[in-house]
Structure formats: C-alpha cells, structure tokens
Amino acid sequence: MNSEIERRRTFAIIAHPDAGKTSLTEKLLLFGGQIQVAGAVKSNKIKKTATSDWMDIEKQRGISVTTSVMEFDYNDYKINILDTPGHQDFAEDTYRTLTAVDSVIIVVDGAKGVETQTRKLMEVCRMRNTPVIIFVNKMDREAKDPFDLLDELEEELIINVRPLTWPIESGPRFKGVYNLYEHKLNLFQPSKQVVTEKVEVDINTEELDNQIGAPLAEKLRGELELVDGVYPEFNVEEYLKGEMAPVFFGSALNNFGVQELLDTFVEIAPSPRPTKTEEREVEPDEPKFTGFVFKITANIDPNHRSCIAFCKICSGKFSRNTPYYHVRHDKTMRFSSPTQFMAQRKTTVDEAWAGDIIGLPDNGTFKIGDTLTEGEKLHFRGIPSFSPEMFKYIENADPMKQKQLAKGIDQLMDEGVAQLFINQFNGRKIIGTV
C-alpha cells in the first residue's frame, strides 16, 4: 500500500489568464502518452482544441472556465493534474482546488512577469504551506531580463527562488536553456510535437562555444557564476515546506523546457501529505479510507444530465461497491461506478489510493466539503468559502419555466459556483459570485 501512495503526485497548475497553463497541461499529457497530438488553446477555429478545455464556452473563447482533472503514468509515477481557470470570474473554483493538491506549478508569462491573479493564488498556497515550482513561459518571445524576473518573483510572491534551468537569450535570439540541475545544455528547436535533445556540455570547455557561439558562451558563463553567487543552493526540505521555489524557463507551446520540469517535478514533489480535520490529522498511509468532496460538476457527459462529485482520497484505499459512511447524512453508501478522468473522458475504476481524485455519481447527495470514511466521524478543514464580490438580479423571462430556473439555480449553488440571496422586501433572487 505504501509503495502505491509513494508514487502518487497530485498537483494543480495555476496562473494569471493567458500565461499558458492549459498549453503546459497539454504538453505534460503528451509526455505522459495520454494524447498523441497536443491541442492548441486558440480562439479561432482550430480543429483540435485543448484536452482540458472540454466545455463549449472554453472551446469558443480559448480560456479555461472550470477545473479539469487528468491523470497519467510517467516513469512509474502516477500523476494527477488539475488544470485550473485563471480568469478571476472563476476564481472560487481555483481556490477550492488548491485544498485538494499536494503541490503547485505556477506559470508566469516571461514578458509580463507576476500578475494580480498569480499573487492572490500564491497567498492561498502560502496559507497551506503548499510547495511551489515556477515555470517562466513564452521565452521564445521577447521577455524580461531573467535576473529582473527572479527579483520580481521573490518580491511579489514573497518566496526564495532558485533557478534550475537558465535561458540563453529570449525572443527570436532564444537559443535554449542550460540545465543547472543536470549540467546539460538543451538547444531550442521550435516544434510543437518533437521532444528536444539534450547535449551534455561542460560549461568551461570549448564545446559550449561550438554549440552556441563564443559571445553567448561567455555571457552564459558569467550569468551562471552570478546565479551561483546570488541564489542559495536548491534545498528540497525548504521546497517541501513552501519556503523555496525552483524556477524553470521554457516555452510550453513549442514543447521546450517542459520535460526538464516534469523530470525534476516527479523527483522532488511530495507524495500525498497529511490532511487536517477538525478532529485530528489524517495520515495518507492509514489503512482506512477517508476522502472529501472539493468540487461538483454537472453535464460532463452531454448525453446524461448527471452530476459528478470530485473526491480527493486522503488516506487508505477506495474500493468499488464497498459501503462507505457519509458523515453529513449519517448513513452508508456504496458506489458501483466510480470514475477517473481525462478531462471529459472518464473510465470506471475498481480501486484508488490516497492522493488520487475520483468521480462519484451524484444525484443530489453531495455538497462541497462532504466527508466519506469507513465509519469515523471526521470533518475536513480548509474548504474555503468566500464573500461574493459581484451581484446580479435574476429575471425569469418565461413564467412557464419557473421550475427549470429554480433547478438550474440549485445546481449552481451545489457546484459552489455562486451563492444565492433573496431580497426580503420584494422576494427577488440575487446571485453573488467571487
């Protein structure tokens, strides 16, 4: 059981809108062998849209509006990715997702640096001491000076940083990155499908001059010396405490720097961590199953108007058709068709372990924050609820459809997307979102 839990890596990809989260997710799935061709996040009519953007609105607008869950195997690790929305209209979904992950990759646009949404999300990570890796994206376009970017990351995100790869120029002059973790040079070839080759180079030899030219080689040596002098050695313990963030540079769209990120990630990222409940702390290697619902989504399958409750397993092993105790309802339930996800595609699973995220069919029995156990009364802490910031009245244009409207509003409330208020003077309904 322990070996199964040890090989789990559950993380979220977060960023400001359009920094390249979904493009990075696509490339990680490409390496995991889950998709043969990476989709593009484009607003125009490209045939292949991103796997994690499965809603119609996401395909039309080229943005993510709901958190997608995808899982794949890579180098004997089982990886669960949650691709989150960056747009602040859908922020509550993202904040809640952060309670279900053990680590986070933050994507930063190399030209724009740290933006407002990134700052807010980092605060949530800091509250939970979540380990963070930073990926500076779009280096194949004109970007800020890497040293300026690192200073900005330290100041804005209030965390120590340590670059593990270093860019050689940016924009049209972008030559590649030098991997400080493995001491290898990766030369850039713009390609959306091909994986780039690595060249082992000692930076003090002429081999480096031959690969990238003498002026750039000289500049790179000086910069790497400065990096080693200014930034502390990378310390895995500090990373796991959420005090230090390793930084990678690359271009997700051109598939560059992504494999270094993935290889280092599976090596250093934490396996499932203990989860706090109001009663006690739950360790992932406990023999008994516990889990909590952090998200509910309707209409994943267009042919069925079904709801799915996303459940994060916190300890033990989940088995299909086994009775489990629903703490809020105070009754046992069994699940005949639990599923695992590839965004919209789902497959039925017979068993799942701590760290995994499973989908449970929901016909109104679940609410966000519900706990499932083998009989113990536990209440998981830290599913945040936020005060709404935007309010709108709801008007029903067709009085004959009063029932459908009421049902639709209930569904939104259950999904935790919005909160409902009723004006006590005139009974009008008001929806509030974060």
Regions found by a protein language model. Name each.
Residues 1-434:
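Structural and coupling elements of P-loop NTPases
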